[in-house]
């Protein structure tokens, strides 16, 4: 990637644009970056860029290492990808800048981990690390996009892995997974962790997405049942949980996104 620091005149800019070497500023909510994980039976570096306006899919800049079982959070400028398992648990994170499709190093996690989850707002991403040292953990990290700093966040109420998370600009709802119904409500201001209304069934290998009002949780693998179609609707106002419309097929280990500001459900 060329160095764009310093002063550029209009002719130089137009020459760079013509050569596809000038970064294009993307409006918030225009693209989603997908890390594919396992491809053809092996961990991959492959990422796709999905453009919402015309439902087009293109190659995105690859990850720094082949990986799977990671997590990601971001804002309208960058996405922070915790790579997860790169052959073993990893603390590596990548910073994907949407303008220019640039992949760079992000500040590492506090511990090597995988099977985590993440949610955040425009300022911070809260990463539940999942499996650390071969066991489910309560560890969470707070990643501040401005300055790319990583510090400890308030721990979960119980050890967990394979959960999911979604939220709005104020709180993140973390379904802890590990075949339990427990959910936590993480308030970004003050870094406060509290009990949230439980899921309708004990489950793990989940996914979640939402907007400023509700989050939809696909429960994934329900304890004693297996892969499921079950979804819950969590309403932030009142902290209520209700049944949501089921998925089209039994599934587990999926993923989800929604069309708020890129990377943030606002």
Model-derived features with residue positions:
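Polar, enzyme-active/binding microenvironments
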Residues: 1-266
């Amino acid at each position: 990637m060329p160095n764009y620091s310093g002063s550029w005149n209009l002719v130089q800019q137009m020459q760079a644009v013509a050569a596809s070497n000038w970064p294009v500023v993307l409006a918030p909510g225009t693209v989603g970056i997908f890390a594919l994980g396992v491809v053809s039976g092996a961990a991959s570096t492959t990422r796709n860029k999905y453009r919402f306006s015309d439902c087009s899919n293109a190659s995105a800049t690859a990850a720094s290492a082949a990986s799977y079982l990671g997590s990601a959070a971001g804002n309208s400028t960058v996405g922070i990808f915790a790579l997860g398992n790169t052959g073993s648990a990893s603390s590596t994170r990548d910073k994907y800048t949407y303008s220019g499709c640039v992949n760079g190093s992000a500040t590492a996690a506090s511990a090597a981990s995988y099977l985590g989850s993440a949610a955040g707002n425009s300022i911070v991403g809260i990463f539940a690390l999942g499996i650390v040292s071969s066991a489910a953990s309560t560890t969470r990290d707070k990643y501040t996009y401005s300055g790319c700093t990583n510090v400890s966040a308030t721990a979960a109420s119980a050890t967990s892995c394979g959960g999911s998370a979604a939220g709005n600009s104020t709180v993140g709802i973390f379904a802890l997974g590990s075949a339990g119904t427990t959910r936590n409500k993480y308030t970004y201001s003050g870094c406060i962790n509290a009990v949230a209304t439980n899921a309708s069934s004990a489950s793990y290998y989940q996914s979640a997405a939402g907007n400023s009002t509700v989050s939809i949780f696909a429960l994934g693998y329900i304890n004693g049942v297996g892969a499921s179609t079950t979804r819950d609707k969590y309403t932030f106002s009142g902290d209520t949980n209700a049944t949501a419309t089921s998925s089209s097929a039994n599934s587990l280990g999926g993923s989800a996104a929604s069309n708020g500001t890129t990377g943030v459900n606002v």
